[in-house]
C-alpha cells in the first residue's frame, strides 16, 4: 500500500510478528514509497495455485484481532488484498534429461520463508548460461548435467531451510527459548546464503567440460 496511508510507518526496516499458527510481515519497497505486507494464516480450504486470487480485507483483519495495534493500523488502511496457498514440495531428484533441463520454480518450488525463490532462479540462470556458453549441440546433455550437479544440492538446502524457517515462525514450535536461539543462529546460514557467488563455480564446471 502507499506509504502515505500510514505515514508514520518506518521505512528503514522490515518487521515480523510471530504467533500461534500464524505470523505477519511488513516491509518497505520502492525506496519506501510502498509498504508490502503479508499475513500467513492456516486454512483447511483447498485453493488453486494463483498469484492473483482476490482476498477479503476484512477476513485478513479478523485473522489478526488482538495482535499488535500497529498491525491493526496497517490493516485498517487495506482496501484490496490477494491470497495464495503455500504448498510445500520435496526437492526433485532429477532436473535434466538429455537436452531438456529445468530451472527456477520448475526445478525447485519453495516456500517464501527465506525470500529466495527469485534469487535462486537468477543463480540458476547465471549458472546455466555460463556452462552452456562452453557447450555445443553434441555436449549439451553433459553441460545440462553439470549444471544440475552444480545447483541441485545447494537449492535443496535452501528449500529445506525455507521450510524449517516457516516452522520457527509458529510460536507453537517446540520450546520458544530454543526457537529464538535458532532464529538468532540462523544469521550464519543467511550470510552464507547471501554471500554465495555462483559465477566462479559455474566457470569451473564449464571448464571441466572442455
Please place each PLM-identified region on the residue numbering.
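Conserved FAD-binding catalytic core of PHBH/FMO-like flavoproteins
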Residues: 1-79
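Short aromatic-enriched loop/helix-cap "lid" or pocket-rim segments at secondary-structure transitions
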Residues: 11, 50, 158-160, 170
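Residue-level signal for pocket-adjacent positions within structured domains
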Residues: 1-4, 46, 81, 87-90, ...
